[in-house]
Amino acid sequence: MRIEVKLLPLKDNPILPFNYNYEVYSQILEKVNSIEPTIAKLLSSPHGFWTFSRIIVRKRKILPDKGIEILSDDVSLYISSSNEDIIRAIAEAVEKSPEFKIGELSFLVGDIKAIKVKELGKENVFSTLSPIVVRTVKFEGNKLRHWDLYPHDELFMDRLRKVMILRYSEVMGETPKDRDFTIEVLKFKPTRLMVGSSYIRGSLMVFRYAGSEEIARFGYENGFGEKTGLGFGMVKLIE
């Protein structure tokens, strides 16, 4: 299930910062916790029970040193989960507390509407609405650190497959019957976003997915890759 949240900027010449994932995440979490603490625990789970998009600004101007100047009357935030209770709680919480603040910019929720979930097959073409994060760990000196992977990295596909199977098992309570899938990257753009006090690298891309329909559906509803609850890995079906 997925929803679109329309946000109305509350000042003239609004400029949206480039980095806002953690602000959106923390405000949604706080709003949901005020009415459904049990659901809020799912939202903060590392297994990724949900995902959300970048803030979609359909008419904009990029200001390299400042952010994104919003030239449209409103912007959109898409939120998705296979758990309808999560989406219901988010919609109710956001309607009850309709203010968002991102950097110096305040928004008011103008509308919330359900988006029709499309039927998927064994082969689909997806486009990302927020970057896909795939990570591994490496030793540097005597320290273990996270290493973000891009699609051209040798470990990317193997790590993505393992992450999706693990997340599916944790969220759905069972392992997928078909675990095999491949992706063919058709377009790719690397990203680096500040989330809290750390940078996270990810991949905006269009990709052809083939294989497990269970994992395709799970990724479509809950996001592909890691850190989906922090606003990564959301996709839309384009073919």
Swiss-Prot record:
Checking InterPro entries in the record gives:
Cas_Cas6_C, CRISPR-assoc_prot_Cas6, CRISPR-assoc_prot_Cas6_N_sf
Question: Which positions make up the signal peptide?
Answer: none
Q: Which GO terms describe its biological process?
A: defense response to virus
Query: What keywords appear on the UniProt entry?
Result: Antiviral defense, RNA-binding
Q: In the record, what terms sit under GO molecular function?
A: hydrolase activity, acting on ester bonds; RNA binding
For this protein, the record's PANTHER family field holds:
CRISPR-ASSOCIATED ENDORIBONUCLEASE CAS6 1
Q: What does this protein do?
A: CRISPR (clustered regularly interspaced short palindromic repeat), is an adaptive immune system that provides protection against mobile genetic elements (viruses, transposable elements and conjugative plasmids). CRISPR clusters contain sequences complementary to antecedent mobile elements and target invading nucleic acids. CRISPR clusters are transcribed and processed into CRISPR RNA (crRNA), also called psiRNA (prokaryotic silencing) in this organism (Potential).
Q: Per the similarity annotation, which family is this?
A: Belongs to the CRISPR-associated protein Cas6/Cse3/CasE family.
Q: How does it assemble?
A: Monomer; homodimer when crystallized in the presence of crRNA. Varying the crRNA sequence varies degree of oligomerization and structure.
Name recorded for this polypeptide:
Putative CRISPR-associated endoribonuclease-like protein Cas6nc
